[in-house]
Design a protein with these regions (language model features):
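Membrane-embedded multi-pass helical conduit in multi-pass membrane proteins
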Residues: 18-47, 352-437
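Cell-envelope/extracellular polymer assembly enzymes that use nucleotide-activated donors
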Residues: 83-86, 118, 281
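Short, acidic, metal-binding catalytic loop of nucleotide-sugar glycosyltransferases
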Residues: 102-116, 191
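A conserved acidic beta->alpha catalytic loop
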Residues: 122-130
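Long helical/loop segments within the catalytic core of UDP-sugar-dependent glycosyltransferases
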Residues: 145-160, 164, 178-276, 287-288, ...
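Short aromatic/hydrophobic "clamp" motif used to bind/position activated sugar donors
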Residues: 167
Length: 440
């Protein structure tokens, strides 16, 4: 990274911190009406948490820039044993025509010894037509009579009948490219060799997460006819943020397109069944046992993202409530098994879902002043501009620079704002301890 860019990144944080210190010590209306004071404190808290999430991204970019930019996929060392791998295609009630595409794509995956690739359709619906599909493509079929634990139960049932040292998880709609295995398994074979040579200074890899990629337009691209103008809304996390997480050894598991070391999944008790986001919680458990996780940047599979509002609401509700629920299950603030870096990543993920409530506060603050003359910042306009503007604009310039061409910040904020009403109630409801199983 060029030195001038590093200076701008650091300066953005310094100016932003100066502004926040001014806000806390000089701009809170302590003698105002109780309602005004409470809202002013909520606004300051929102600004602090928003800045924290930005600082994490910028600092990770500063200290890990070279590592993420030079992330290279190792090649198979044919002098080393090629491990067996189970490829589990998870299905519940998806159409067979959709599942057929994924199964067909899986049969064309490259591997040095294809006899060591075991493709399995794990169908908790026990459907005869899916069984016939497995026979047609000469892959294995696993089913169960009654599944009480949704996707996690389906995968756990399949794992009980499999024994390869590695396994991959694919959703029913997620078609793997031919290089899916050759872009993920070599990380493990290289790690196995390093563990043999230097076990005291090498951490084992628990899983490798490849990006979530979609061949259809997302709900925003589709309805606003912006397929060629903006990228898919999930690209920024999958191909940027999670790669940064992985550069620190703590990539998040996002539910599909990942390859796992079987022994650590068994060690943590399989896929968690007491959460609606078993993916997020499983990845956290694996990291808490001292195993690292890696995220790659280039897509090696492609699936379908929902484009109707009903499906999007259900999806985001499940994500929001599930992450909050899993963070509570894992005690991310106090769990001694979670390292400092991993804790920062998890807290940052937790705070992301609370960003919807922060946006509501940001919208309300100027409206309160415009309509009711409620002043929640104890400062005149020009002092506010002098202290706030330099840090704000430089910070947002830096955030835009760190996102490269994967993310447009303005579109990102617009998308989040449109989902505010969907997620806000769910967050408060689930933070109180309530659960919602039928979102699976």
């Amino acid at each position: 990274m060029p030195k001038i860019k590093k200076v701008s990144y650091i300066l953005a944080i310094v100016l932003s911190v100066i502004y926040l210190l001014w806000r806390v010590f000089f701009a809170i209306p302590w003698h105002a009406h109780i309602f005004t004071l409470i809202f002013a404190l909520l606004l300051v808290g929102s600004e602090i948490f928003s800045s924290f999430t930005a600082y994490v991204l910028i600092i990770f970019r500063l200290i890990r820039a070279d590592k993420t930019q030079k992330l290279e996929i190792p090649e198979f060392d044919l002098q080393q044993p090629i491990p067996k791998i189970d490829v589990i295609i998870v299905t519940h009630n998806e159409e067979v025509s959709l599942l057929r595409k994924t199964v067909n794509a899986a049969t064309f995956m490259d591997y040095p010894d294809k006899s060591k690739v075991n493709i399995v359709i794990s169908d908790d619906g026990n459907r005869p037509e899916v069984r016939e599909l497995a026979k047609e493509y000469q892959v294995n079929y696993v089913t169960m009579e009654k599944n009480k634990h949704a996707k996690a139960g389906n995968i756990n049932n399949a794992l009980e009948q499999l024994d390869a040292p590695l396994f991959a998880i694919l959703d029913a709609d997620m078609m793997p490219f031919s290089n899916f295995l050759t872009s993920s398994v070599p990380f493990f074979t290289e790690n196995f060799a390093e563990l043999e040579e230097n076990p005291d200074h090498t951490k084992p890899i628990g899983f490798v997460q490849t990006p979530q990629s979609f061949y259809n337009a997302d709900i925003f691209q589709f309805n606003l006819f912006l397929q060629d103008a903006v990228v898919n809304e999930q690209d920024f996390f999958s191909r940027d943020v999670n790669v940064l997480n992985g550069s620190n050894g703590h990539a998040l598991f996002t539910g599909s397109n990942a390859v796992f070391l079987r022994e650590i999944v068994d060690k943590v008790g399989g896929f968690p069944t007491d959460t609606i986001t078993e993916d997020f919680e499983l990845g956290t458990k694996i990291n808490s046992e001292g195993y690292i996780s890696i995220a790659t940047r280039e897509p090696v599979s492609s699936g379908i993202t929902p484009v109707d509002i009903k499906s999007v609401i259900k999806q985001r509700t499940r994500w929001a409530r599930g992450v909050i629920q899993s963070c509570r299950n894992m005690h991310i603030f106090t769990n001694p098994k979670i390292t400092l870096l991993n804790r920062i990543i998890l807290i940052n993920t937790w705070l992301y879902w609370w960003s919807f409530s922060r946006r509501l506060i940001y919208i309300a603050a100027p409206l309160l002043y415009a309509l009711f003359k409620v002043q929640v910042v104890n400062a005149n306009f020009w002092i506010l501009m002098i202290v706030w503007a330099p840090g704000y604009f430089l910070l947002h310039f830096v955030l835009g620079d760190t996102s490269s061409n994967i993310r447009n910040e303005r579109w990102g904020e617009s998308r989040k704002l449109s989902l505010l009403h969907i997620c806000l109630f769910q967050l408060f409801w689930n933070q109180s301890g309530s659960k919602l199983r039928n979102l699976r």
